[in-house]
Amino acid sequence: MLCCYDGLSAVRLIRAEHDITLMERATGTKSLEAMAVNGEDLEATQIICRVVCDLHKAPLPTGVPDLSETFAPLLSAASHPIFDACVTSARALLSDPAKVALHGDIHHENILESTRGWLAIDPKGRIGPPQYDFANLFLNPHTNTAFVLDPARMRNLANWISKTTGIDEICILHAAHAHAGLSACWNSNDPENQEYPLTAANLLHEILHS
């Protein structure tokens, strides 16, 4: 995926051999996580949006999994009121015909400051609707759960992302709701860690239906 981005708002891949990669360093002093929890959440979100919009300009790569494969665990999850609601949002997300080269794991720690500006690192690579790349912001910064699980902050995020990217707020919220359910599925054998995304999924469901 780094080759696909060719340095546009992403670190440059300098060399790759077998399982070893040499990448451009991004060693700025600012942190998007610190900005978000210290009164600059809007500014941090706008930076993330600009980076992601640049990433989505990349041509669609070959051999990259479709987002539907990522959601297979949720779509096949045992019936549960929360999961059932998240499945509905996942189907709404996956039915969107828009397709871009998704980073697949956008959060505050995966965009770093550099001499070239803010750059994304560690892409997972998927093909799917652009709103999915903003879904993980509704679970992050994960080190401050009280901050993240604030319904007012969730509403603000959807509004800020929509205004910056032009993506419909409801589409953004469906993506976030679906991703929270997926995250809960990934943690199905770890009840302690599952509680966090389940709580987020509940809150996002309430926002979607308010």
Where do the PLM segments sit?
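Conserved NTP-binding catalytic cores of kinases and kinase-like/nucleotidyltransferase enzymes
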Residues: 1-16, 114-115, 200, 204-210
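A conserved alpha-helical element in kinase catalytic cores
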Residues: 1-22, 26, 30-55
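ATP/Mg2+ or Mg2+-diphosphate-binding catalytic cores
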Residues: 183-210
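Small/polar glycine-rich anion-binding or flexible loop at a beta-alpha turn
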Residues: 174-181
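An alpha-helical support segment within catalytic cores of ATP-dependent transferases
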Residues: 57-104, 114, 163
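Soluble or luminal CAZymes and related metallo-dependent hydrolases
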Residues: 43-47, 82, 153
